[in-house]
Amino acid sequence: MASSYLLLLSLAILASPQTTTHAFSTNQPHHSPPQRVIIIGAGIGGLATAARIKSTLPSSTDVLVLEKNGRDKLGGRCGSFDVTIVDNNNGGALLFRHERGPSLLLLKEEYERLFEDCGKRNPSAADTGNDSSNTTRTAAEAYGLHMKQCIPAYQVVFDDGDAISVGFPRSKCQSSGLTIPQIKELQILEQQSIAKLNQLEPNGSSKWQEYLNTCAAFLDCGLPNFIEERLDVSTLPAFLIEALKDGAKRWPLQPHSVMLDALFDSPKLKAMASFQDLYVGLEPYRNEGQLGGGVLRKTAPAVFGLLAALELHPTNDKAGVFAPIGGFRQVAESMLELCLDNDVQCQFDTSVTRITDEGVYFTSKDESEGGFLPADLIICNADVPFATETILSESSNDDGGSNSSKYDWNDKFDYSSGVIAFHWSFSQRIEALNTHNVFMSVKSAEDAVSSWSILRDGDDSKTSTNNKSLKDQPFNFYVHRASHTDESAAPPGCDSIMVLVPCAPLVRNPELASLPRDEAILKYKQQFDEDLVNDVREAVMERLSILQGLDNLQDTLIDEVVDTPGTYADYYNVGGGVPFGLSHGLGQLSLTRPGAEPSSHDNVLFVGASSRPGNGVPLVLIGAKLVAKKAIEKLRSK
């Protein structure tokens, strides 16, 4: 059985169509056999890297992607799932779509660039979906990826019931699908938001814009020079002017809260300006007990204000929050089509159990079949802390051991928060919610700091293991309502809601490392029991009820799917069950973050959220471009 499974994989590679011409020299004789590249994981990093390598070296490489999950979990954390509910009133079924990972799309041009660089389809023949106003078709749309801007970008809801919308681009008329009445409605909402900013503190609107301008300078300099790893000296003057303004009160490497205290008086404005720090696994507040106020580990340096500019700046050409029509599953599907057009081979339900410089050991989903596949180069899209601890061999002579799957991770890193996710299907429309909503606790300065305690305390503080209900504690959370932008997410008159509540990561137990993977995962899932999940659900429902019309929300809840860190560990082998990966303190940022090339292996490269440059789909796409370049150089030198 094992030999037949290995033969099947080998034949899949050999049977792939080969292009006879290519634009780049590989420094090899034309009669040389193709070099085999194995990519572990069909996440965004794996798919993008595969497409870039194969499109650059079409005839001199065979690229094979091995994915442990089935076809339904293509894209790794970047994916969606459906819930089907029997419609007892009208017969038939109700279909709800939910996101399991990312729910907002940033740096749209990074997605476009991948399809422009590797695509083989004619954009002029693309289906533009339901957007009849869009006459300029893109390479991404040729592969079915349509991205619609969310305006406003966010609704921020405070625990006293105050709410404000932020993120209004100046060029609203250019946004897809907006009619003149819709534009006028948004203009009224924007004026209401400006008035609200000025109510929060004198000149609040101008202070807010001043903050976004500073953050835009950080973004314009940081993206090319520190994320894309390409020098752009033209951005440095504006960066330095903003950093040194007001006696260097906006210095980018100080704790984020220090800069916010210098700019704002209102706790609500400070909260609005810093909630994006959650995405990079950090709190905004200075930690007096740590060196540099905590910026080396758990406190966000002020430079991460660039995330606010990326999402909310009205005129910056990189700014804007978008939604992929059809959900983030469509992002992965479009990328798979891109790979297949470039003759990349993908094999699902296949787990890699060991990586060596010579190739990989693998096993089928039920572990009844497996073997060894040699490779000239291996690219690992599995989570770095998991891979280095569990599947990356320490010896080039490794025989693969038992060739059974395990789950463990390196807990020496600093991690982002874990997440308890509620995926709710409702029999009513939840009109009080925008596409993206952030609920923040700011009743007092103490509450504002305490609401981020899960990021400061980490493993020392489970969500409610202090015997105090979450309802009695300040906490922040995020709510996604996909149907506000994309009506296909829920049936007419219904809604799909995702709630993300930060929690502690899994606590590593070294004794579980030797157990079969399923047994270890089961024990880790027990760290988040039903009582804890129930407490979090009740706390969220209570906070949601502050919005008009949501006081009896549970009455129309018809289905619930709950994910905890144990779920994410099971589905995606992420270290600590943390969907956001490693945090981005200065000790794990840029050159101090795990790089693409592990020092112990010459023929292995890493790509993905926990490696350089960092987490989030656009950063992973940038990382994939950098890793593909390294891979091509390695292959050409062999």
Regions flagged by a language model, labelled:
Residues 2-17, 21-25:
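N-terminal chloroplast transit peptides
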Residues 33-225:
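N-terminal glycine-rich phosphate/pyrophosphate-binding loop and immediately adjacent elements
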Residues 102, 609-632:
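A conserved FAD-binding loop/helix module that cradles the flavin
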Residues 216-342, 349, 570-586:
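Active-site/ligand-binding neighborhood in enzyme catalytic cores
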Residues 271-295, 474, 478, 542-613:
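A glycine-rich dinucleotide-binding beta-alpha-beta segment and adjacent secondary-structure elements
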Residues 323-324, 350-491, 598:
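Mid-domain catalytic core of redox enzymes
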Residues 425-563:
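C-terminal segments that line or cap access tunnels to active or ligand-binding sites in enzymes
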Residues 633-638:
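Active-site-proximal substrate-binding core of FAD-dependent oxidoreductases
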